[in-house]
Amino acid sequence: VPAMIQVMILEPQCPETDFSSLAYILYGGSPIAESLLRKAMKTFSCDFVQIYGLTETGNCAVCLPETAHTSSNTNLLKSAGQPFPGVSVAIVDSAGKKLPPSQIGEIWLKSPAKMLGYWKLPEATAKTLVDGWIHTGDAGYCDNEGYIYICDRLKDMICYAGENVYPAEIENILYEHPAIQEVGVIGVPDEDFGESIKAIVVLKAGMQAKALDIINFVRGKLADFKLPRSVEFVQTLPRTPSGKVQKGKLREKYWQGYQRQVN
């Protein structure tokens, strides 16, 4: 996962290590910041391949091959790739209607390797597997060439003043900040706008930054409604054993007393 790539790059011995025998790095599991991917490609000087899929789809469903990582179309570095042969992808709205290219919706996958169902969990199966389609819970879109772009987990989407904001888009920008080592963007309760955007930041050792510096770094790179409204500095971010940031744990203390983590 991207977090492991970042840990390797931050390892003090990394600049002195000979990686000439390294042929491929396969990565996936969570969105990767473009700045981190470019740094990794330069550091390891090997081929990179991204894999996207779920356990429910037989893991591998979409692939961004090594050739796409070095394509003149640099926008492909933001993509998860194209479906493997035999895999179908649909981008749908909340009513299950298929959306045209460039429109964001939920990613559905149909694969010959998809699960039959969850063991002894018929309700969960009925919710996730519908008419042969796996409902991934991921928000994304496709382009005219069939490349899939993942925005974020639907459950992590922030609704600010009626606008849908995907944290990964903001995090991708913030990872370019020279003082930021890690960042997680979440929605917190806001009486006026429903949810407000908060950036939880881990600074690099020996680096300093103020909240306004972080906010202004995003200004001009994204629409104003996507700017963080507040910043909290912490020592570490909670992660799963595989290295994914646990957004639910980041939100917990802000949503205590609320019946749901959306306002």
Write out the residue ranges for each language-model feature.
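AMP-binding/adenylate-forming catalytic core of the ANL superfamily
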Residues: V1, S111-G117, K127, A139-K226, ...
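Alpha-helix capping/helix-boundary segments
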Residues: M4-I5, I32, K114
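Gly/Ser/Thr-rich phosphate-binding loop
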Residues: I9-N75, S88, A95-K98
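Glycine-centered tight turns that cap/initiate beta-strands
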Residues: Q13, S21, S45, G86, ...
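Active-site glycine-centered loops adjacent to acidic/histidine catalytic or metal-binding residues
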Residues: G29, G53, G81, D138, ...
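Conserved ATP/PPi-binding loop(s) of AMP-dependent carboxylate-activating enzymes
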Residues: Q82-G86, A95-T128, E163-V165
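Conserved beta-loop-beta connector loops within the AMP-binding
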Residues: S88-W108, N144-E145, M207-A211, Q246
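Acidic/polar alpha-helix N-cap and adjacent early helical turns
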Residues: E252-N263
